[in-house]
Structures are given as C-alpha cells and as structure tokens.
C-alpha cells in the first residue's frame, strides 16, 4: 500500500471533529417573574458551564440590562424589573461572545486574566491573548 492510499485510508477512518457549537452550549435561561423581579432560576448551572465567577457574570448582566441584581440563598439571580427570557438569553450570548469564546480560534477554552488593570482573554487552546469584552 502506497503513501497516498495510506493517507486516504487514515482520513476516512479519522472521526470528524465537532465544531464549537456542538461542544459548547449554554443552558437556556429559565426565568420567571416574582413580584417586580425576574428570577433567573438556572443561573448556577449557567455559571458552571461558562466557568466564570458569578459576580463577573452578574455585573455584566446588570450593565447589559440596566438594572440591579443579587444572588439569593438558592443561587438564583434576582434581577430588579421584568425581563423576558429572550432578552436575558441575548445578554448571556453577548457575555459568551465577549468573555468566553476565543476571537482567534472560536473555542471556549479561555481564562480571564488581569493585565495592567485590563481584563484579557487568554486562550488555552491556541495561546491567543485578546482584550476581553470585545
């Protein structure tokens, strides 16, 4: 068997590598109204999936939604005001784009670091360093 035949055989037997969408997904926000507050029921599973500090994500959501928030004793995020599920999901997706997904390789294997007072996204997959939140 020649080189070309071996190469063709190897490529046929190699499984396809799944893209980032299949490998990384964030749970859809489970939100409900409770009085004048919106309760993000599955905030903790979302934080676990994002692998970020809950205070960082909460602060981002506060800024993005223009409201105040706190985390209750059950780990749920309580947002002051009424927000639809689609709006909270949009804000979470914006967070993922700016603070989780590497802008160079598109993988979620990143860490937030402080560098000279600025937040930097460091990718553990490709080694890229880029400003966070862009």
From Swiss-Prot:
<dbReference type="Pfam" id="PF01873">
    <property type="entry name" value="eIF-5_eIF-2B"/>
</dbReference>
<dbReference type="InterPro" id="IPR045196">
    <property type="entry name" value="IF2/IF5"/>
</dbReference>
<dbReference type="InterPro" id="IPR002735">
    <property type="entry name" value="Transl_init_fac_IF2/IF5_dom"/>
</dbReference>
<protein>
    <recommendedName>
        <fullName>Translation initiation factor 2 subunit beta</fullName>
    </recommendedName>
</protein>
<dbReference type="InterPro" id="IPR004458">
    <property type="entry name" value="TIF2_bsu_arc"/>
</dbReference>
<feature type="region of interest" description="Disordered">
    <location>
        <begin position="1"/>
        <end position="32"/>
    </location>
</feature>
<keyword id="KW-0648">Protein biosynthesis</keyword>
<keyword id="KW-0396">Initiation factor</keyword>
<comment type="subunit">
    <text>Heterotrimer composed of an alpha, a beta and a gamma chain.</text>
</comment>
<dbReference type="GO" id="GO:0003743">
    <property type="term" value="F:translation initiation factor activity"/>
</dbReference>
<comment type="similarity">
    <text>Belongs to the eIF-2-beta/eIF-5 family.</text>
</comment>
<feature type="compositionally biased region" description="Basic and acidic residues">
    <location>
        <begin position="1"/>
        <end position="12"/>
    </location>
</feature>
<dbReference type="InterPro" id="IPR016189">
    <property type="entry name" value="Transl_init_fac_IF2/IF5_N"/>
</dbReference>
<dbReference type="InterPro" id="IPR016190">
    <property type="entry name" value="Transl_init_fac_IF2/IF5_Zn-bd"/>
</dbReference>
<comment type="function">
    <text>eIF-2 functions in the early steps of protein synthesis by forming a ternary complex with GTP and initiator tRNA.</text>
</comment>
């Amino acid at each position: 068997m020649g080189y070309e035949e071996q190469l063709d055989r190897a490529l046929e037997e190699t499984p396809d590598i799944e893209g980032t969408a299949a490998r990384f997904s964030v749970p859809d926000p489970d939100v409900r109204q409770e009085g004048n507050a919106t309760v993000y029921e599955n905030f903790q599973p979302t934080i676990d999936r994002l692998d970020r500090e809950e205070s960082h994500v909460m602060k981002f959501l506060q800024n993005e939604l223009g409201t105040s928030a706190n985390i209750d004793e059950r780990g749920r995020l309580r947002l002051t005001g009424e927000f639809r599920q689609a709006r909270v999901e949009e804000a979470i997706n914006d967070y993922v784009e700016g603070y989780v997904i590497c802008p160079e390789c598109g993988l979620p294997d990143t860490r937030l670091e402080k560098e000279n007072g600025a937040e930097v996204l460091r990718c553990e997959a490709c080694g890229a360093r880029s400003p966070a939140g862009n």
